[in-house]
Amino acid sequence: MKKDLLKRTIFAALALAIFIPLLVIGGLWLQIAMGLLAMLGVHELLQMKGLNTMTPEGLLTLLATFALTIPLENYLTFLPVDGNVVAYGVVIFIMLGCTVFSKNYTIEDAVYPIAMSFYVGFGFNALVDARIAGLDKALLALCIVWATDSGA
């Protein structure tokens, strides 16, 4: 038990040493890091459910998460104001379209990856938006999460 706690503490300190400078720098580097972390989180959630991410369903889920996390309208200027939501919707439409044309892939199979990509992607998007609004707002959001997490 103590060994696991020590391992988690060391990993948290190492992650903070990498994450805090990225948060201070902000910009594209933070957005890419948040997108990769969101994809890692969805990968873990899919594995917990017994789903493989190296399938079309898993790859579309990772793409949907990344599309929702990153403010795409900053980089793809032809997209409307909520470009990441539009891109997310297109990927979800493809996933739901697969349920129509496949006998082995039902709507029940598609719901969990869609829900996880929305939940994780929107959460990381909120952190990216908070950082765009200012470092103080991003730190406040993180302190709230860390305070509630440490009490659990």
Question: What is each stretch, according to the model?
Answer:
Residues K2-A152:
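Membrane-embedded alpha-helical bundles of polytopic integral membrane proteins
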